[in-house]
Regions:
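Conserved subregion of the PPM/PP2C metallophosphatase catalytic domain
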Residues: 1-16, 20-187
Length: 187
């Protein structure tokens, strides 16, 4: 989704549980991320300020659009813990802000499967989890990471529904097979 001119928000999440309750929580997580990132505005509603739960490295511009957007992860965590903590619902989440001009991707991986950067030779990089899941720990610190995605590269994010799927013979698909699929495709 578009955040500001030249910045795109990229998000994928997987809520714990199954069924209607889990689906409703996923809708809540989605709405909170979009509202707190500034993608959606609510007339007359004051949003909370910075939580200081997204660490900003001193050498970076902490007032940049990406940092404000990434703060949405911490604000979502705070909201879920305070208002729904007794339900023990949480989500793994990958949220990134892509500067479409430079290819810079600033992201938080909150316990989600590693996103993959795929180039002409196959898998170039795994974007490993850097932070805890969202909605479980009241004082969680979310650590942003930064990479540059080269022109022509593919960013692939997925849920464990891909790697946990089974063949008709009950064979697990797994992470290794997923990596092999992309290495074979690009060679």
């Amino acid at each position: 989704f578009e955040l500001s001119e030249g910045n795109m928000g990229l998000v994928i999440a997987d809520v714990c549980g199954k069924g209607v309750g889990a689906a409703l929580f996923m809708a809540l997580f989605r709405s909170l991320i979009r509202i707190f990132s500034g993608q959606t505005s609510l007339e007359g509603v004051e949003l909370p300020g910075k939580t200081e739960m997204v660490e900003c490295i001193a050498s970076e511009n902490c007032d940049a659009d990406y940092h404000r957007a990434l703060e949405a992860v911490s604000l979502t965590n705070k909201y879920i813990v305070q208002n729904h903590g007794d339900l023990s619902m949480f989500a793994t989440l990958f949220f990134g802000v892509l500067d479409t001009a430079s290819g810079k991707l600033s992201y938080i991986n909150a316990g989600h499967d590693s996103a993959l950067v795929i180039g002409p030779q196959g898998v170039k990089q795994r974007l490993e989890p850097s932070s805890p899941v969202v909605g479980a720990l009241p004082e969680a610190i979310y650590l942003p990471r930064h990479i540059v995605i080269d022109s022509g590269d593919i960013l692939l994010a997925f849920t464990d529904g891909v790697t946990d799927s089974r063949s008709p013979g009950d064979e697990l698909f797994g992470h290794q097979r997923l990596h092999h699929l992309f290495d074979e495709t690009f060679h």
